[in-house]
A protein has these predicted regions:
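Positively charged n-region of N-terminal signal peptides that target proteins for export
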Residues: 1-4
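C-terminal/domain-edge helix-coil "capping" segments
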Residues: 22-53, 72, 112, 124-143, ...
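Generic secondary-structure transition motif, activating predominantly at the C-termini of alpha-helices
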Residues: 18, 80, 84, 103, ...
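N-terminal segment of the mature soluble domain
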Residues: 54-142, 146
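Bacterial N-terminal signal peptides
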Residues: 8-20
């Protein structure tokens, strides 16, 4: 994942909000509202890594952009299916297959511009994204879409890795953003930090 001034600015935008409100627990995934439904999970398209990790061997395996996105998709999908099995999650690999079969009617799930949903100012889906998601959900007779909008890694003051996520659920028909959460967690490795951040919004006692 490239570390440039642009990445640094994205990190600042993504991480500032959770850091400002750590006393408030992140909003949990609304599992009870989604139970029994087919819910597509869009691929993540933005992973920002603090430039401070440039020479850190801990991040050596996360420097290839596509591989890092695939890893993040896998971790998110695993957490959703293991911790919220009552929802019929339609994960990125299947979404891509469905989109390929409906080429010309459905946009590529990796190129819908979903990272823009990390902005807390958005209350409605932008028109083009709304149209893309409406077409996508029609393939599975769904309505609600789960969007991992962005993932950021930074160095915690105690030296651990800090993972911060921007997660959104939206109604593809009405265009309304129904839920937003900004979980954050620390861990000895990027994988451990991300796993803990996901667990924060997927508590087992919901």
């Amino acid at each position: 994942v490239p570390r440039t001034p642009i990445v640094t600015s994205i990190l600042a935008l993504l991480l500032a909000l959770p850091l400002a409100g750590q006393a408030v627990p992140p909003a949990p995934v609304p599992i009870h509202s989604l139970g029994g439904q087919d819910v597509p999970v869009l691929p993540i398209t933005l992973v920002a890594i603090d430039p401070a990790f440039d020479s850190d061997t801990l991040f050596a395996s996360y420097r290839e952009h596509r591989a890092t996105l695939t890893w993040a998709d896998s971790a998110i999908g695993r957490a959703l299916t293991e911790r919220a099995p009552e929802v019929k999650w339609v994960l990125p690999p299947r979404l891509r297959k469905l989109a390929r079969r409906a080429a010309g009617l459905v946009d590529d799930p990796d190129e819908m511009g979903q990272a823009m949903l990390r902005s807390p100012k958005l209350k409605e889906l932008p028109d083009q994204l709304k149209a893309s998601l409406r077409n996508l959900t029609a393939l599975i007779n769904g309505r609600i879409v789960f969007v991992p909008a962005a993932l950021g890694f930074s160095r915690d003051p105690d030296g651990q890795v800090r993972a911060e996520l921007s997660l959104v659920a939206a109604d593809a028909r009405s265009g309304r953003i129904l839920w937003r959460s900004l979980p954050a967690a620390v861990g000895a490795t990027p994988s451990a930090a991300l796993t803990s951040a996901l667990a924060a919004v997927l508590p087992q006692d919901q």
